[in-house]
Amino acid sequence: MPAIVLIGAQWGDEGKGKATDLLGGRVQWVVRYQGGNNAGHTVVLPTGENFALHLIPSGILTPGVTNVIGNGVVVDPGVLLTELRGLEERGVDTERLLISADAHLLMPYHVAIDKVVERYAGSKKIGTTGRGIGPCYQDKIARQGIRVADVLDPTVLAEKIEGALELKNQVLVKIYNRKALEPAEVVENLLEQAEGFKHRIADARLLLNQALERDEIVLLEGSQGTLLDVDHGTYPYVTSSNPTAGGASVGSGIGPTRITTVLGILKAYTTRVGSGPFPTELFDEHGAYLAKTGGEVGVTTGRARRCGWFDAVIARYATRVNGITDYFLTKLDVLSSLETVPICVGYTIDGKRTDEMPMTQSDIARAEPVYEELPGWWEDISGAREFDDLPAKARDYVLRLEELAGAHVSCIGVGPGRDQTIVRRDVLAPS
């Protein structure tokens, strides 16, 4: 069976956890392939139980599914253990969670540097979560990182941490006037934490490819979204990894030819957390309505999300750079009770119309949305389970988004619950 990639098609917070949870009962593996605890997934079970996951794949809530934290993820050991403990206290079986030996560990000095650098940046800050994600990826690229497998050899681990802190302490003390970290203490704390997860360390790329050879289905779950991709996003207001579909192969060890379906997650409107350009952002009562009705508060940061109308320019862009084959449209129910529902179909930049993603940072910062207005609907759609159950105007809205985005809207979320979903096409069915 093929591998399936599930990615956010906007600036994150699109509802990827709901999509993973919906598909989880029919797949054998769920893999998180990038990012760290700087993003969160919210899953609402049919029982009404609400789970917020930051590092562990959403498939952990589905019995029988093996979950993998892939090599592309940066893992904060303390956060991992806290999240595991929280799940276990609520009766969730976590035995089927594995961690790639090649994933990188997020260290205390990464968090310290992240926070102090962002603080000193002042008005030029990019809105980092302050959880050390960027500095950890910097060390990975500089070949100075600590990998999960290193905890299995205390001698190697101590050598690596001592070497890293020779430089990190210079930065913390001499540049930012902060206290130096003691290498022996960092090593001791990490080895103590490792006792809680080292039995989960595995050769993930081997296991995943063997699973595909056995015709098992592997779901590759990204965090954040396309417009936060370090290469394809609104740089520099991006994350430090590749949430796009290309990152799924690199961050899991599964070859690209194994991937046959790319399921993009789109919110029926647009949100963003932190700094950066946002052409359709609303500052009026409509923005307040979307924020309140949609419950737009970050799962990980607790920060209020900026809200705006649906942006078809970035949806079309996401379709292209990810090779999206299908879309899962979430939170359509939030748009009920609006007289009209605008869709951004293009931009004007210095008076010139464009329907494509601007090439430069300065251009997207100056982009003004060009709207097409569709009539709204007043009906409560949270009970709809078939496409024809939706009001005609809601169906028209979905079909117009589908046309503009350039990929089939196969699933539609009409509420937070797992069962509050309309399936127009089965994305797991053989093509």
UniProtKB/Swiss-Prot annotation:
<feature type="binding site" description="in other chain">
    <location>
        <begin position="38"/>
        <end position="41"/>
    </location>
    <ligand>
        <name>IMP</name>
    </ligand>
</feature>
<comment type="similarity">
    <text>Belongs to the adenylosuccinate synthetase family.</text>
</comment>
<comment type="function">
    <text>Plays an important role in the de novo pathway of purine nucleotide biosynthesis. Catalyzes the first committed step in the biosynthesis of AMP from IMP.</text>
</comment>
<dbReference type="Pfam" id="PF00709">
    <property type="entry name" value="Adenylsucc_synt"/>
</dbReference>
<dbReference type="InterPro" id="IPR042110">
    <property type="entry name" value="Adenylosuccinate_synth_dom2"/>
</dbReference>
<feature type="binding site">
    <location>
        <begin position="12"/>
        <end position="18"/>
    </location>
    <ligand>
        <name>GTP</name>
    </ligand>
</feature>
<dbReference type="GO" id="GO:0000287">
    <property type="term" value="F:magnesium ion binding"/>
</dbReference>
<feature type="binding site">
    <location>
        <position position="40"/>
    </location>
    <ligand>
        <name>Mg(2+)</name>
    </ligand>
</feature>
<dbReference type="GO" id="GO:0005737">
    <property type="term" value="C:cytoplasm"/>
</dbReference>
<comment type="subunit">
    <text>Homodimer.</text>
</comment>
<keyword id="KW-0547">Nucleotide-binding</keyword>
<feature type="binding site">
    <location>
        <position position="305"/>
    </location>
    <ligand>
        <name>GTP</name>
    </ligand>
</feature>
<keyword id="KW-0479">Metal-binding</keyword>
<feature type="binding site">
    <location>
        <begin position="299"/>
        <end position="305"/>
    </location>
    <ligand>
        <name>substrate</name>
    </ligand>
</feature>
<protein>
    <recommendedName>
        <fullName>Adenylosuccinate synthetase</fullName>
        <ecNumber>6.3.4.4</ecNumber>
    </recommendedName>
</protein>
<feature type="binding site">
    <location>
        <begin position="40"/>
        <end position="42"/>
    </location>
    <ligand>
        <name>GTP</name>
    </ligand>
</feature>
<dbReference type="InterPro" id="IPR001114">
    <property type="entry name" value="Adenylosuccinate_synthetase"/>
</dbReference>
<feature type="binding site" description="in other chain">
    <location>
        <position position="224"/>
    </location>
    <ligand>
        <name>IMP</name>
    </ligand>
</feature>
<dbReference type="InterPro" id="IPR042111">
    <property type="entry name" value="Adenylosuccinate_synth_dom3"/>
</dbReference>
<dbReference type="InterPro" id="IPR033128">
    <property type="entry name" value="Adenylosuccin_syn_Lys_AS"/>
</dbReference>
<dbReference type="InterPro" id="IPR018220">
    <property type="entry name" value="Adenylosuccin_syn_GTP-bd"/>
</dbReference>
<dbReference type="GO" id="GO:0046040">
    <property type="term" value="P:IMP metabolic process"/>
</dbReference>
<dbReference type="InterPro" id="IPR027417">
    <property type="entry name" value="P-loop_NTPase"/>
</dbReference>
<feature type="active site" description="Proton acceptor">
    <location>
        <position position="13"/>
    </location>
</feature>
<keyword id="KW-0963">Cytoplasm</keyword>
<feature type="binding site" description="in other chain">
    <location>
        <position position="129"/>
    </location>
    <ligand>
        <name>IMP</name>
    </ligand>
</feature>
<feature type="binding site">
    <location>
        <begin position="331"/>
        <end position="333"/>
    </location>
    <ligand>
        <name>GTP</name>
    </ligand>
</feature>
<feature type="binding site" description="in other chain">
    <location>
        <position position="303"/>
    </location>
    <ligand>
        <name>IMP</name>
    </ligand>
</feature>
<feature type="binding site">
    <location>
        <position position="13"/>
    </location>
    <ligand>
        <name>Mg(2+)</name>
    </ligand>
</feature>
<feature type="active site" description="Proton donor">
    <location>
        <position position="41"/>
    </location>
</feature>
<keyword id="KW-0342">GTP-binding</keyword>
<feature type="binding site" description="in other chain">
    <location>
        <begin position="13"/>
        <end position="16"/>
    </location>
    <ligand>
        <name>IMP</name>
    </ligand>
</feature>
<dbReference type="InterPro" id="IPR042109">
    <property type="entry name" value="Adenylosuccinate_synth_dom1"/>
</dbReference>
<keyword id="KW-0436">Ligase</keyword>
<feature type="binding site" description="in other chain">
    <location>
        <position position="239"/>
    </location>
    <ligand>
        <name>IMP</name>
    </ligand>
</feature>
<feature type="binding site">
    <location>
        <position position="143"/>
    </location>
    <ligand>
        <name>IMP</name>
    </ligand>
</feature>
<comment type="pathway">
    <text>Purine metabolism; AMP biosynthesis via de novo pathway; AMP from IMP: step 1/2.</text>
</comment>
<feature type="binding site">
    <location>
        <begin position="413"/>
        <end position="415"/>
    </location>
    <ligand>
        <name>GTP</name>
    </ligand>
</feature>
<dbReference type="GO" id="GO:0044208">
    <property type="term" value="P:'de novo' AMP biosynthetic process"/>
</dbReference>
<dbReference type="GO" id="GO:0004019">
    <property type="term" value="F:adenylosuccinate synthase activity"/>
</dbReference>
<keyword id="KW-0658">Purine biosynthesis</keyword>
<keyword id="KW-0460">Magnesium</keyword>
